[in-house]
Swiss-Prot record:
Residues 41-46, 94-100, 141-146, 189-199 are extracellular. Optimum pH is 6.95 and 7.05 with lysoplasmenyl-ethanolamine and lysoplasmenyl-choline as substrates, respectively. Belongs to the TMEM86 family. This is Lysoplasmalogenase TMEM86B. Pfam families: YhhN. Catalyzes the hydrolysis of the vinyl ether bond of choline or ethanolamine lysoplasmalogens, forming fatty aldehyde and glycerophosphocholine or glycerophosphoethanolamine, respectively and is specific for the sn-2-deacylated (lyso) form of plasmalogen. One of its GO terms (biological process) is phosphatidylcholine acyl-chain remodeling. Its EC number is 3.3.2.2. The gene is TMEM86B. Residues 1-23, 68-75, 118-123, 164-171, 219-226 are cytoplasmic. It is found in: Endoplasmic reticulum membrane; Cytoplasm. It comes from Homo sapiens (Human). It is a multi-pass membrane protein.
Length: 226
């Protein structure tokens, strides 16, 4: 897999010359609108709430199936989106927090695999360790002992995804950055101290991150045909 070519994005995703991109993104946009308009309270635990939360990410997986050239990069992104949807559903129920975190960790590993390791950019890795690393250490201080290891492991995987996304650049880099921001706010709000409007910030940056990473698969503007 050539990660450099795989990560090239269209300069104008929704230009007049590419109306299919906008058309096939409309289910994602509409499902996001439904989510934010319904704004189901977090204490209302139901499969309906899980479906409403998962639907935008599943729409992005469908978008890739229609619009993106077939290949390993696209398939890895689709797998990551499906794992993310599983994580979204699990996080509706507090008791399923660890399985949800495991699902998102799997999604990040698939993103790392998709982004590849060329160019390596070890200096960027050092910067990421020196920047989000202390924040992760601070969050870990607020955890119960049995949560330290899984959260630390997840944080390291997330930083690896950020490293490879930024190394690839383009919309993948911006998506990786927003995903890290979303998870950072979620971690602080969940484990350290409740933040005002945290849920709105978390979900807005999360959906934007998944969209940007998805768009990195558009190496070719031509929809797949049978």
């Amino acid at each position: 897999m050539d990660a450099g070519k795989a990560g090239q994005t269209l300069k104008t995703h929704c230009s007049a010359q590419r109306p299919d991109v906008c058309r096939w993104l409309s289910p994602f946009i509409l499902s996001c609108c439904v989510y934010f308009c319904l704004w189901i309270p977090e204490d209302q635990l139901s499969w309906f709430a899980a479906l409403v939360k998962c639907l935008p990410v599943l729409c992005l997986a469908g978008f890739l199936w229609v619009m993106s050239p077939s290949g390993g990069y696209t398939q890895l992104l689709q797998g990551a989106l499906v794992c993310s949807a599983v994580g979204d559903a699990c996080l509706i129920w507090p008791a399923a927090f660890v399985p949800g975190m495991a699902a998102f960790a799997t999604a990040h590993l698939l993103y790392v695999w998709a982004f590849g390791f060329s160019p390596l950019q070890p200096g960027l890795l050092l910067l990421i360790i020196l920047a989000p690393g202390p924040y992760l250490s601070l969050v870990l201080q607020h955890l119960e002992p049995d949560m330290v290891l899984p959260v630390a492991a997840y944080g390291l995987i997330l930083m690896a995804m950020l490293w490879r996304g930024l190394a690839q650049g383009g919309s993948a880099g911006w998506g990786a950055l927003l995903f890290t921001l979303s998870d950072g706010v979620l971690a602080w709000d969940t484990f350290a101290q409740p933040l005002p409007h945290a849920h709105l910030v978390i979900m807005t940056t999360y959906y934007a991150a998944q969209l940007l990473i998805t768009l990195s698969a558009l190496r070719s503007p031509v929809p797949k045909t049978d």
